[in-house]
Structures are given as C-alpha cells and as structure tokens.
C-alpha cells in the first residue's frame, strides 16, 4: 500500500429512488471522463466506478473520502442524503458482497458480476485502476465464483429481465398469442427474450436502433424484427412492452403512448422499463388502461423468490466473510513491506559505511580475505539485528496492527513512501508529520 486507504461512496436501490439514481448513472464516454476526473485529484491514487440500473458506487484509494463524495454531489446536489460511505475493510466487504450478488435486488442474479468486471476493465483501460484495485477486484471476482460454485444461490429468477417476465406471466397467465414488444436488443433485452421464449411466448417483436443486433436477437428466439421508425405502430399492436435501451432519455414518451391508446380502443397496455436512466416516461402511468412498472417496482415481485433463497444466501455470506478477512490480512501484511525494505536499506547503508571506515583505518594491514571477513561480519550483524523486528512487524501487520510499521518508520527516521524513486532523499520525520497532519 502507499499510505492511502480504500473508500467507497455510493447509492443503490436500497438508499435512493430511481429519480436520484438516474441522475448520477454514467455509461460510455461520460464514465471514462468521470474516471479521469477522479484520478486527477491529487489525493487519489486509484479509482473505479460501478454504474448499473440499481447502483452507482465510487471506489477510491485515497487520502480521504471527499473526492468520491464530490462525484455525487456535483451531479445531484440532493444526493447526499441517499449516500452511504464505507472505509477500509467495510468497503472491501461491500465490493465482495456486491460482486457475489448478495446486495442485489434479486439476490443470486448473474449480471452484476459481469457489470463489476466491466467497470474494473474500463477503469484499468483509463489507467484509473492500478495494482491495488487489480488485487481487490480479482479477489472479489474469485469470491463471486466460489459463491456461484459452492451454493445454489443462482436458482430461480436471477435477473431483472427474468423478474420482469415473471411479472408479465402473473398479469396475463398464458403468454401464447400475446404480442410482446422488446425495445432494445442489449443484454437486458436478450435475457428478456430468452425468458419469454422459455415460457412459451410465440409473438415476440423486437425493435432496436441497430438493425443488425435486433435481427440477430429476433432470429434467436423465433421472433420478428421491426424497424425503429415503426415504434408508434408497434405500441398499438403490442400487449406488453419491455424497454431496455442505453438511451439517456425517454424513448417511450407520454404523447407516444397517448396516441397509441386512442387506436387501441380501451385495450390495456403493460409497460415495463428496465433501464436506468428510465426510458419510459413515468407520466405514462397516468393514462387510462396503461400499467407502467420500472426497476423499483420489480422489488415487490422479487420478495417470494428471495425467501426461498435465504438459506443459500447465508452460506454465501460465510464464504464472502472468509475471503474478506483473508484479503484484509494480506493487505495489512503488504503495508509492512515498504517499512521493512527501507529499514533494511537504512541498516545496510550504515553497516557499509562503518565497514569502509574500519577498512580505511586498517589500511594495508588486511589482505583481500580479511576485507571480505569484515564486510561479511557487518552484513551478519545487520541480519541478526533485523531478524526480530522484521518478524514482529510482519506479525503485527498480519494481525491488523497497522500502527506498528508507521511507528517503526518514525523511530528509525526512515521514509515509508513506496512512491519515492529509488535513491531519492527520504522525507525528514518532521516533514512527514506535517504532511500527515494536512491530510487528516
């Protein structure tokens, strides 16, 4: 480590309504720009951002939490009351639980791991995530894989798309003959289409801005592709519309639905919006015979499935906790390494200087063998003197006593900054104390 701590600031379906989440959700170039902005902060060493339909979370390795908090308040000034913040082991535990889908609206859902992997990949490509985030994220991914392999937490409806399809089935019963329109052919759209096909839906319509992607999905599920410009007419034809595009604004507007309802002659229309930011104008729900649901409404459908999965979730929590403690122990042990390296370098410099002074006094009295004996003796003294302190520093770090390595650095007047180039002068003890005071 580099003297910095890991901080997490975020909001999720548990802490904030969709109206707040959609204002801070970022994708594509906007997310890349946000990563660069975070990394540019002087106090931030590494960063990555998880942004999904149910959560936006900022992880930073930094001197303090403010850069992560500012990410939210600059985008949504009223977000502060919905934020949660975690530091150190608590932040590590949270990421592990999120990756293992234990903090998801649908516990056991499979999409979140891919989303966190994608978030880390983007941060790595933007050079915002470095060696610490690499170790952290890869350990979180391995933990999620253990949970998936060693428990049955993934049984039943395990994605928002599957939950949406379950809702459709509850409303209509038999799906045969029902016209179901999928607006968007991305991951959510594909999962919805496959779940519908399994339940026997035989009139699946797909529309997408990119015809190639839409055609491919329609062929996979035996559906029909329609052009994006046909959306107004498709809203007249469909019984159910499931919307999940990457658009940052409403795709299905109130005016569009109002016009469609005039032509439907009092036939009800079910709108399910799986996107964040929302793609269906919430004002559509005010229209007669229109039943609109967004991702927050899905939580009511999820409850029964969650109860059946409670036992597996407890087993998964135990796996996560064991992995968190193991990672934290390794992290703390690493914290001692820079101190140990500097302590040994400091001692060896003194030993070499004293050996050279002794040899210069003895002059020609010593042959080459005698000189080597003096140098070997100096190194042996260093090794014996440092053996005990080295063992105690490693043990202290491994048991979470993070104060001892810092105290050792202060006691011996050595630099505990791994970012300092090799051979550069160490910062004086009083300078380090002042810098530490400024950060706190």
Curated annotation (Swiss-Prot):
Gene3D superfamilies: Glutamyl-tRNA reductase, N-terminal domain, NAD(P)-binding Rossmann-like Domain. Its EC number is 1.2.1.70. Pathway: Porphyrin-containing compound metabolism; protoporphyrin-IX biosynthesis; 5-aminolevulinate from L-glutamyl-tRNA(Glu): step 1/2. Residues 406-440 are annotated as: Disordered. The keyword Hydrolase does not apply. Keywords: NADP, Oxidoreductase, Porphyrin biosynthesis. GO terms for biological process: protoporphyrinogen IX biosynthetic process from glutamate. CDD domains: NAD_bind_Glutamyl_tRNA_reduct. Residues 421-440 have a biased composition (Low complexity). The active site is at residue 53. Catalyzes the NADPH-dependent reduction of glutamyl-tRNA(Glu) to glutamate 1-semialdehyde (GSA). Possesses an unusual extended V-shaped dimeric structure with each monomer consisting of three distinct domains arranged along a curved 'spinal' alpha-helix. The N-terminal catalytic domain specifically recognizes the glutamate moiety of the substrate. The second domain is the NADPH-binding domain, and the third C-terminal domain is responsible for dimerization. During catalysis, the active site Cys acts as a nucleophile attacking the alpha-carbonyl group of tRNA-bound glutamate with the formation of a thioester intermediate between enzyme and glutamate, and the concomitant release of tRNA(Glu). The thioester intermediate is finally reduced by direct hydride transfer from NADPH, to form the product GSA. Belongs to the glutamyl-tRNA reductase family. This is Glutamyl-tRNA reductase 1. It comes from Anaeromyxobacter sp. (strain Fw109-5). The gene is hemA1.
């Amino acid at each position: 480590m580099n003297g910095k701590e890991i901080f997490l600031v975020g909001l999720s379906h548990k802490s904030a309504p969709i109206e707040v989440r959609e204002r801070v959700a970022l994708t594509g170039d906007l997310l890349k720009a946000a990563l660069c902005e975070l990394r540019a902060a002087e106090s931030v060493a590494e960063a990555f951002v998880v942004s999904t339909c149910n959560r936006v979370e900022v992880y930073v390795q930094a001197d303090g939490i403010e850069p992560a908090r500012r990410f939210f308040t600059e985008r949504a000034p009223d977000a502060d009351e919905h934020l949660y913040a975690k530091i150190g082991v608590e932040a590590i535990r949270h990421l592990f639980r999120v990756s293992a889908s234990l903090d998801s609206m649908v516990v056991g859902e499979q999409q979140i791991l891919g989303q966190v992997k994608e978030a880390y990949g983007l941060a790595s490509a933007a050079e915002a995530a470095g060696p610490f985030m690499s170790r952290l994220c890869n350990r979180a991914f391995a933990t999620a894989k253990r949970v998936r392999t060693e428990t049955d937490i993934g049984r039943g409806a395990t994605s928002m798309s599957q939950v949406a399809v379950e809702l459709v089935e509850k409303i209509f019963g038999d799906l045969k003959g029902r016209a179901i329109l999928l607006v968007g052919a991305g991951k959510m759209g594909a999962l919805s289409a496959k779940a519908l096909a399994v339940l026997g839906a035989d009139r699946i319509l797909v529309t997408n801005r990119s015809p190639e992607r839409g055609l491919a999905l329609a062929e996979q599920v035996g559906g029909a592709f329609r052009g994006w410009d046909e959306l107004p007419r498709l809203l007249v034809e469909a019984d159910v519309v499931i919307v999940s595009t990457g658009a940052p604004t409403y795709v299905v507007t109130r005016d569009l639905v109002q016009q469609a309802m005039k032509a439907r002659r009092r036939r009800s229309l079910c709108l399910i919006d799986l996107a964040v930011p929302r793609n269906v104008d919430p004002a559509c729900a005010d229209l007669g015979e229109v039943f609109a649901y967004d991702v927050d409404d899905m939580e009511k459908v999820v409850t029964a499935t969650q109860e059946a999965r409670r036992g597996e979730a407890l087993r998964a929590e135990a796996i996560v906790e064991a992995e968190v403690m193991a990672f934290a122990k390794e992290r703390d042990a690493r914290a001692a390494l820079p101190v140990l390296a500097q302590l040994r370098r400091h001692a060896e410099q003194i030993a070499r200087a004293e050996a050279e002074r002794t040899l210069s006094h003895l002059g020609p009295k010593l042959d080459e063998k005698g000189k080597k004996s003096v140098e070997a003796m100096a190194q042996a003294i260093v090794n014996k003197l440092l053996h005990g302190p080295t063992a105690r520093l490693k043990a202290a770090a491994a048991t979470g006593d993070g104060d001892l390595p810092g105290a050792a650095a202060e006691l011996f007047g050595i630099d505990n900054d791994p970012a300092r180039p090799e051979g550069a002068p160490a910062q004086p003890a009083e300078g380090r104390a002042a810098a530490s005071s400024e950060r706190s």
